[in-house]
């Protein structure tokens, strides 16, 4: 065990970052692409039901799934950042205690979300942005998704902890296996067993449970930290570090959910087609950015290990390398998305009104999409270094500080076109805000070590 950990330490602190980050990133990129693909699978197969209300319901419930994911990322990123730095310090005892504390805390929180959500199902559906016509579909989909909340939150913790230990391959196997299963189960449950939109939800939670089991097995392999209930330490010290490391993710994911709710509320004025179109565009853009997020996840353990070991020059090298690669990637994705916008939207809902609304929104977002390379890599760098204040500020900037007020202001002044262009405006403002903050972080890394 100790020999495996020492070899992993040498790998993370001595291999050139231009070789190490792609090696760490490849499983993460595959995981993110497959995850984004199966997130779109529900939208695709539900779209085949030929109902704008059903397609809209998937978009409405997506905001709650984002909240559940936010909880998972809070505990996963919070514990994972701590783990990577402590392994960098060769402090394996505290790293092991943090792993168990983060995992079981997320599991308990998922159970709480499940119980409360089922108790207040209909009010929750309206809060998420459901209309009266969408409500029956929303309740059918939402009630099943809530049942999977415990393992949805805890599997994200396992995924993040494995990545931060440099074991992204185990994380990839767990995530991709569940994703492939989901894609197979969707048509079976929706059409063959005639479960409709509820079948899509069952496919999602069954596949995520399989992922959870495989990720749990991965924690016992390759010198990774093992999870034990006896290792859970309900100490303020550990929860403070979870809070510091996970708050940016909670803020980012949580506000993404709030932003989706605001978007649905603004779009509902223009009918089910508008809600369906904006939901489809969200899924497309998520898929477009998934490779960038995956590459950044490959950068994070490299950042954490080397920051913990005091090798600040490697942290800076890794940041610049990641920004360059992801900028080129997003530029290519943006060009393809802009050129093929009508065709992409029509894959999920072949309705003229949905296609028209979605095409304009997708093209607006493609204009500024490549700027996310600097914003996201910078935010991941800040978060992994434990710089809670700038990391949290930048995490809330895009969807909270800028998007939420922008979508309401533009909706009131420009109507539907304002809703369609709101994300583009928010992305530009976020980039302008992030430049001086990340420059300050890079200067901090250039200062003499104390």
Q: Which residues does each PLM region occupy?
A:
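Short alpha-helical transmembrane segments in multi-pass integral membrane proteins
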Residues: 1-25, 83-150, 192-247, 303-368, ...
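Transmembrane helical elements of multi-pass membrane transporters/channels
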Residues: 23-42, 144, 178, 207-211, ...
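Small-residue-rich hydrophobic transmembrane alpha-helices
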Residues: 55-115, 152-171, 277-341, 372-394
């Amino acid at each position: 065990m100790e020999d495996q950990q020492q070899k992993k330490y040498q790998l993370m602190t001595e291999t050139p970052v231009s070789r190490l980050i792609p090696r760490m990133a490849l499983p993460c990129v595959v995981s993110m692409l497959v995850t984004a693909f199966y997130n779109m699978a529900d939208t695709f197969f539900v779209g085949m039901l030929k109902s704008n209300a059903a397609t809209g319901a998937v978009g409405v419930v997506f905001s709650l799934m984002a909240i559940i994911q936010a909880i998972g990322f809070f505990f996963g990123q919070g514990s994972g950042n701590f783990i990577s730095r402590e392994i960098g310090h060769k402090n394996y005892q505290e790293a092991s205690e943090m792993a168990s504390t983060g995992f079981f805390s997320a599991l308990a929180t998922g159970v709480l979300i499940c119980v409360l959500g089922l108790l207040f199902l209909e009010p929750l559906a309206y809060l998420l942005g459901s209309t009266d016509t969408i409500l029956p579909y929303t309740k059918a989909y939402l009630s099943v998704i809530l049942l999977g909340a415990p393992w949805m939150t805890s599997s994200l913790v396992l995924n993040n902890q494995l990545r931060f230990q440099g074991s992204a391959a185990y994380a990839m196997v767990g995530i991709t296996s569940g994703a492939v299963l989901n894609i197979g189960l969707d048509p079976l449950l929706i059409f063959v067993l005639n479960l409709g939109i509820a079948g899509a939800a069952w496919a999602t939670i069954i596949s995520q449970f399989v992922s959870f089991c495989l990720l749990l097995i991965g924690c016992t392999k390759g010198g990774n930290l093992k999870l034990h209930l006896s290792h859970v330490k309900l100490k303020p010290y550990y929860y403070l570090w979870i809070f510091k490391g996970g708050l940016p993710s909670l803020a980012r994911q949580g506000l993404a959910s709030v932003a989706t709710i605001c978007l649905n509320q603004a779009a509902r004025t223009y009918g089910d087609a508008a809600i369906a179109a904006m939901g489809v565009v969200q899924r497309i853009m998520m898929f477009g950015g998934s490779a960038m997020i995956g590459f950044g996840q490959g950068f994070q353990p490299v950042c954490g290990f080397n920051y913990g070991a005091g090798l600040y020059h490697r942290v800076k090298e890794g940041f610049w390398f990641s920004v360059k690669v992801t900028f080129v990637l997003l530029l290519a994705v943006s060009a393809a998305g802009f050129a093929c916008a009508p065709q992409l939207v029509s894959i999920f809902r072949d309705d003229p009104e949905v296609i028209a609304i979605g095409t304009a929104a997708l093209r607006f977002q493609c204009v500024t999409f490549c700027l996310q390379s600097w914003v996201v890599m910078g935010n991941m760098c800040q978060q992994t270094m434990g710089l809670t204040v700038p990391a949290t500020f930048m995490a809330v900037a895009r969807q909270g500080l800028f998007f939420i007020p922008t979508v309401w202001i533009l909706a009131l002044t420009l109507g539907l076109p304002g809703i369609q262009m709101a994300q583009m405006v928010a992305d530009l403002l976020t980039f302008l805000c992030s430049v001086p903050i990340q420059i300050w972080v890079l200067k901090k890394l250039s200062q003499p070590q104390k």
